């Protein structure tokens, strides 16, 4: 793998995993525009992608480190019968993780086979943009209402939204932010819950494939560099996004980008052969 391609994929993963624009969709579409085909199951590429997932997860853990310490402490306090907001949120995160975790383990590879056509991925990206626009309307409609605490049923609903991100072109963070807004969270709280909820899923995606990283010792240097670059890009991305939504940033901006990018890619692959 060339150095520029390594840097490109690392930064692309770190940014698009957290921005509501679909990391998997971008990982497939953007290289293809340059005539490159990305096979995430290729033996020479898989260890590198494992490191990218772990880099993203470590960046999220570091950014929310104080929050996670409070959540874990609150969780153990709740086990002792002491009700508290942090414990409630930790239970909500556990419940919200279940749907995507189960479906991902059972169906991820089947879903990927169905959506191997890049034109379908482009259409999914367009739909993702429309959903973000609708989510923005929900966000604005609730802007003057007091924020609500998620019930466990709502947390499950938000977690269920993560399942859609198994389809290339749909964004995990985008779908969960939309669901969080629909459940009554402010834009800032919906973003925070989305990133907290995504951390164990992203971590698990890397850890499940971790043994394959050590089965390719000749690629450890590339994987390590990629993981570090992704962690830096992911950390800067989550810091930007949290400030963006704290300042009443809107999902519609990302929705417009996804719709335009999806339309461009759809038009491109209607008239150009897909790389194999």
From Swiss-Prot:
Q: Which reaction does it catalyse?
A: di-trans,octa-cis-undecaprenyl diphosphate + H2O = di-trans,octa-cis-undecaprenyl phosphate + phosphate + H(+)
EC number(s) given by UniProt:
3.6.1.27
Compartment annotation: Cell inner membrane
Q: Does the keyword Membrane apply?
A: yes
Spell out the Pfam families in the cross-references. BacA
UniProt keyword terms in alphabetical order: Antibiotic resistance, Cell inner membrane, Cell membrane, Cell shape, Cell wall biogenesis/degradation, Hydrolase, Membrane, Peptidoglycan synthesis, Transmembrane, Transmembrane helix
Transmembrane parts of this sequence: 1-21, 44-64, 87-107, 114-134, 150-170, 190-210, 222-242, 251-271
Highest taxon, organism lineage: Bacteria
Q: Which GO terms describe its cellular component?
A: plasma membrane
Further remark: Bacitracin is thought to be involved in the inhibition of peptidoglycan synthesis by sequestering undecaprenyl diphosphate, thereby reducing the pool of lipid carrier available.
Q: What role is this protein assigned?
A: Catalyzes the dephosphorylation of undecaprenyl diphosphate (UPP). Confers resistance to bacitracin.
Q: Which family does it belong to?
A: Belongs to the UppP family.
**What protein am I looking at?**
Undecaprenyl-diphosphatase 2
